Amino acid sequence: MNKNRGFTPLAVVLMLSGSLALTGCDDKQAQQGGQQMPAVGVVTVKTEPLQITTELPGRTSAYRIAEVRPQVSGIILKRNFKEGSDIEAGVSLYQIDPATYQATYDSAKGDLAKAQAAANIAQLTVNRYQKLLGTQYISKQEYDQALADAQQANAAVTAAKAAVETARINLAYTKVTSPISGRIGKSNVTEGALVQNGQATALATVQQLDPIYVDVTQSSNDFLRLKQELANGTLKQENGKAKVSLITSDGIKFPQDGTLEFSDVTVDQTTGSITLRAIFPNPDHTLLPGMFVRARLEEGLNPNAILVPQQGVTRTPRGDATVLVVGADDKVETRPIVASQAIGDKWLVTEGLKAGDRVVISGLQKVRPGVQVKAQEVTADNNQQAASGAQPEQSKS
């Protein structure tokens, strides 16, 4: 006898009724759940004054550079400086053998004395003939000749004086001096070397390091944008000069601030960039020519800047920046923007947003354009939490 008993008709009816009731409840709950609006975190856009800075690569260069070359030929007798030391303008660096130049100077002085004596005699003759002019003892022709001889003698004195001065200058050039104050590098010649006037090789190089120049490059497009923003009043500079700060290659901020001096007049055709030159105090000679640095250029003050947290900005496959904005009807819409520059953890937005717009910065993955949402304002205290909790996805177009 089979001990398994079948289901009675009544039991089957009860089971079907219960199943239908449960299905109806699930559908109702699903419908109620679908009607709930997703919650998103938003920030309300506002304008604020912002100092706009740009970080550009650059290299240092000496304020002045003097290549020391001999102006007379001769043998180097002595070097009078320590390589790598700081020197003052006018100090003696090398001594060239002065013997021949001293002799030339002495000879020139002797020729001058002879010329002066001849000029004195010629003048005495003119004076004597002048008294006798008109008498039978001297003719007009003789007087004119004496006068011409005196003038020639005076000209010879002038030439002799010039020869003395030239000899004196050449003698002084045997003492090679520094034309500027600064730090002198290595010597390219030693004692006993023969040097020549106007030679191609410098004896040494002196560089003035305080102040010091920093040459940075900026794209011509950014340069034109900066000029346009300054012209139309979007950016404002104090005293018409932009301040510049430096970050050295080891990541340390240079203690002295500088100012932008000028921009080059031509654009590099290869790179499309333009050179800007800033000047910095360098009293301790911390900066040396040729060092790589990063210059932070204060472009100016934007009195009505709009900053948006970076987690609220997404990029299309083409690289265009967009944000999700909650409208007055609490519906989400996509808004294209121009994010020109990163400022900390925010984007500087120059186009596409205005004060009062509500930008979604958390819960982006839960919404799409046209969906009605429950917007919750994100404050500064929980903005970091929102940033870590919601990573923006790339918009697709």
UniProtKB/Swiss-Prot annotation:
Signal peptide: 1-24
GO biological process, one term: fatty acid transport
Primary site of residence: membrane
Region (Required for growth on efflux drugs): 313-397
Family annotation (InterPro entries): CusB-like_dom_1, CusB_D23, MFP_Efflux, RND_pump_MFP
Region Disordered, residue ranges: 377-397
Cysteine pairs bridged by disulfides in the record: none
Keywords, sorted A to Z: Antibiotic resistance, Cell inner membrane, Cell membrane, Coiled coil, Lipoprotein, Membrane, Palmitate, Signal, Transport
S-diacylglycerol cysteine: lipidated positions: 25
Annotated lipid attachment (N-palmitoyl cysteine): 25
Coiled coil location: 98-172
Subcellular location: Cell inner membrane
A Pfam entry, by short name: HlyD_D23
Membrane topology field: Lipid-anchor
Biased composition (Polar residues): 379-397
GO molecular function, one term: identical protein binding
Record note on disruption phenotype: Cannot grow on efflux substrates novobiocin or fusidic acid.
Function: AcrA-AcrB-AcrZ-TolC is a drug efflux protein complex with broad substrate specificity that uses the proton motive force to export substrates. This subunit may act as an adapter protein that links AcrB and TolC stably together. It is elongated in shape, being long enough to span the periplasm.
Quaternary state and interactors: Monomeric in solution. Homotrimeric; interacts independently with AcrB and TolC as well as AcrZ. Part of the AcrA-AcrB-TolC efflux pump. Complex assembly is independent of an efflux substrate and appears to be constitutive.
PANTHER family associated with the record: ACRA/E-RELATED COMPONENT OF DRUG EFFLUX TRANSPORTER, MULTIDRUG EFFLUX PUMP SUBUNIT ACRA-RELATED
Family label: Belongs to the membrane fusion protein (MFP) (TC 8.A.1) family.
Full protein name: Multidrug efflux pump subunit AcrA
Organism of derivation: Escherichia coli (strain K12)
Primary gene name: acrA
